[in-house]
Amino acid sequence: LEHIRLEIIRQDRIISLWQPRLADMRRNATLYVRASSFCNKDILGPKFFKTQLETLDMDEFLTSICAIRHKEVINKFFANYNKEKHQYADSYIYESILRLDLREHFLLTARYLKHYNKRDELLVGYDPGHFSSLVVGQEKEYGRQLRIIKEFYCCYPDEQPELARQFYEFFGADSLNKRIILYPDRAGNKRREELEQITTDSRALKRELESYGFEVELMNEGQATVYHWQQFKLLLLMFGGRSNALPEILIDENECRNLCSAIMLSPLKKTEGRIELDKSSEKKVPLKNQAGLTTQLPSALIYLLFGRYGNKVLSELSSMPDNLPDNLAI
């Protein structure tokens, strides 16, 4: 018994030694837990998993049930995209954040972004729909670099008012330059009703942002049709560093983590010689899970890039390549 008593005293000393250090670590750390449906295997039973395997395709089964998903498709629409080269992790001004008392309410806003300039205008790509998304960037080094610094999204029934609210909460109080250049879908292949809806959505977002004091210039209205091969080729040029007329692109992997994930999962599809961005994931994945798993956020990025830089390499994009005939408009 004496041996047990002494061992308890020894263990208590070890605990008292480490408790302050562990408490300090907890205040500056995040607990990450990853779990799958197999945690409840005893309750759900084998029949549940058999039914799900028969009902879902393999990608959905691995993602939804097993918490396993593809990290990258083989044939990417963003062919030259390299996360080591085109993503950055030094997102925040940590000196400012660490001075705060994190026990009090803390809201991460643009003022804590290392690469945000409150005096520069914001470039915004917008993909409307039941899943609506914004991708926000700023040009650096006199236009030689484009940094994508933030993503926003919402799902139906939330629409433009919710996107504008999120945008204002993040940028509103910190921005001196209130100018936004908004690049929505060019909608080359849309029916007239769809085109009118996109125009309506874009103008509604413009109105909501302006209600918060931003000055919004709406681009892309009435411009020429954009084809899949043109977008694909522009992305090849931009992410491949093949043109001095185009900026280097860097994406914040902390504030745009869904965009970074979804770019790697955006497949190129060829049908009878036609090249397309395969958007089938937008129909397969539930709305609430689409941010990092579908082509929604990458589409918003494409609208921004083509709207902003397509005219800079017009000669490269004005003639259809011989090996990509009869491509579809989007």
Where do the language-model regions lie?
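ASCE P-loop NTPase helicase motor core
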Residues: 1-43, 48
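Short, conserved catalytic or adaptor-binding loops enriched in Gly and charged residues
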Residues: 10-28, 84-106, 208-210, 238-243
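ATPase catalytic-site recognition across NTP-hydrolyzing enzymes
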Residues: 36-125
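Short, hydrophobic/amphipathic alpha-helical patches that form generic packing surfaces
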Residues: 67, 265, 298-307
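A short acidic Gly-Thr/Ser loop motif
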Residues: 126-131
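Short beta-strand scaffold segments in enzyme catalytic cores
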Residues: 132-138
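Mg2+-dependent endonuclease catalytic cores in nucleic-acid-processing enzymes, primarily RNase H-like
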Residues: 144-286, 311-312, 328-330
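Acidic two-metal-ion nuclease catalytic site recognized across multiple nuclease folds
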Residues: 305-330
